[in-house]
Structures are given as C-alpha cells and as structure tokens.
Amino acid sequence: ILAYTKMQEVIGTLMLDIISVKEYCEKVVKEDVNSSVLTGLNESIDNLKLGDDKTKQYKAELKKAFQEYFLPAYSDIIKTMKELDSSKNNTLGLSHMKNGKEYYELLFKQATGTDKSIEDIKKELNSMSRSSLLAVQSVISKNKNLYDEYVNGKIKTKYKDFESMLKDLDKDIKDDFPSVGTLNYRIRPIGEDLASGGVAAYFNIPALDGTTPKQIRVNMLEDALNVQSLETFSTVAHEGIPGHMYQIAYAYKNVKDPWRNSMASFLGYTEGYATYTELYALKYLDGVSADAVKLQQNMVVYQDCLIALADIGIHYEGWTKEDLSNFLEENGLGVSDVSDFYNQLQANPTAFLSYYVGYVQIANLKKDAQEELKDKFNDRDFHEAILKSGAAPFHVVEENVKDYIESAK
C-alpha cells in the first residue's frame, strides 16, 4: 500500500489527508504494548479458556508479533507520510484529474448500489432537501422556541447509558419490524488510543457461525458522544437495533445462502437502511415531543442531502472551497471557514454517499408504497420487504417492495 502511495505521488494522483493519517498513526505507536488492540486480542485469548500454560504461551507469541510487525507497520506509515511532498498532494476533487470524472462515476455506483445517473440522484437529493426544509419551517412556525432549544442542544432524552437505549429499542420495535428472536450482544468502549472524534460508534459484523455476543463499540471521547443527546440515541439505533445489528441478525436468520451473507457487500443498502432506522427510531422516544422529533429528523435529512450534493460538487463538478462556501451559504449553513469540511470530502470521495443516497432510495420507496397503498400500508410489512434479500443492490430491493405493494392491495 505504501509503495502504491509513493507511486501516486510520482504520477500525480495522490489525494490524502497527510496530517490526519500521520497523527492517528503516531497515537497508535505511542501506546506501544498498552494499545487497546493488544488488550482486546488478549481478552479474546482469555475467553478461549485454554488453561494457564497455553494462555501464557499465546499471549507471549501475540505480544512478539505485535511488537515485530504491527507497530513497525504503523511506524512505516508515519515515515512515508513525512516523506511525501505535500506540494504533490492533490487538494481539489477527482474531476481535476485525467479520467477523474469517469472514475468518480464508478465509485458512485459502487457506493450507492443504484444504477441511476448522478444527475438523477442530484434531482432526488435536491427534492428531498427542499421537502425536509419545508418540514423544518413548518415546525418552527408553530414553535419558535423549539429551534433555539434544538441548536443549543437542550433537547435531551431520558437515557444515562447505551444499554438502556438498546433494551428499550429491542422492545419498542416489536410491532414495526419482523422478529429475529433474542439478540445476544454487548457494548464496549473504543480504546482511547484508537478513538477518533469523527467516529461515534460502530458494529462488528459477526462470523456466520459465531456464537459469541454481537458487539457494538462506542466512542467515549467527550467530543464524540453525549449520552443524552438525540444524535447519540440515533447512533445507537443505527449501529444496533433496528439498524446494523438487527439487519445482520435478520439476514443470518432468513437469507439461507451463506455466500450471500458473507460475500455480498452493498454499502448503499446497508448504510442507507441503517440511516433510515436511526431516524425512524426517534418515534420511540418518551419525553421528547413529536415536533422535536420531526425537527430532528428533517434537519438531519436536510444536512445529509447537502453533504451528498457537496461530494458530487467537489468530485464531479470541480468545486473549489469558495464554491462549497457559496453553496452552504445559499442553503443556510454558512460557516466562516469550510476548509476542514472541504478537505474531509476531498480526501474521501463518495464516503458519505452510501449513507445519504442509500437513505434517499429507501425513503422514496416507502413514499411510493404509502401513496399506492394509502391506509393499507403497514410499516412492518414494508420493513420485511426491504430486509427480505439481505444486502442487495437497490433494483432488487425495489422489486421486493413492488411485490409487497401488489400483495397488499
């Protein structure tokens, strides 16, 4: 990988956030054998209950490999980042490179799981952003103080811990999602040396034949999660129930082909579905008004659509930082300096599209089903339709929804 990175520098296709990569690797190396990676692996050895002698032997071998291979690999990354000529690092989007737009089109299809053109997706994003903004304005017009409470983070949930959120969600979704039986899981913090302020939580995809508890890792850094915030509740729903953990459990139970469960990877579907559920789950909150829930849902969708449009703008239409600043200003999200936001999107083309374009596909399928079926529409049956095939391209999901509509008429 490092040789490839150096080759990119030579031929002019290097596109990295060099400083962030270097700083993260330095943090990992600094922890040395106290790394949470090694700690976690040692815990896995303990859980095997191999006896004192074998446990001691394997831990010693693991520590040796960690010191001889793992840490030096991170040191090599740091060394390479220092050697790179920052003047040869591209600071604009892919469209400024030879064949860059064509490459972005391929990345776009891979990330979104849809065969729709970029122009068609832009229309969908613009349409949804407008409808979300209108919904926000409708809420604010009725309750002007609510928006102030929202932007100042004063709208809180009752929760003090993640476990209580998942326990309640597991109970609350029973009428709206098909059963997957009892979910055995645990929630563990991400080690501080590996944690990043940009990652609030993640779900570890379990082995097909695994029997250990499913695992959600949460970021305990102060700038990552506030336990009582609406965003944290949504994050837990996204990673846990009815999001990734639930969706994987459903697929493992109902999609009998192990190859599909292990090899099929359609991030547009999996992240789009989880984004849909994080917003849907807000309806279950006690002590948070319906208007506050509606405001949160539509503000998130509005901002997500703008992020997706900005990604397209930077990498497909050649936006500069000034272009991005003007776009955000025109849409009510002006900031004094867009550099960090621009650099994040520029260094990671299509990284957010799986979430946001994927969500739009599911939301539009639901809207179509609701308009077609009217009072015959049922959330549980719709959810079963979009879960039916496991991770799949959206043309398959669309066919499942069409079948649901026909059967429900």
Regions found by a protein language model. Give the residues of each.
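N-terminal maturation segment of proteins
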Residues: 1-409
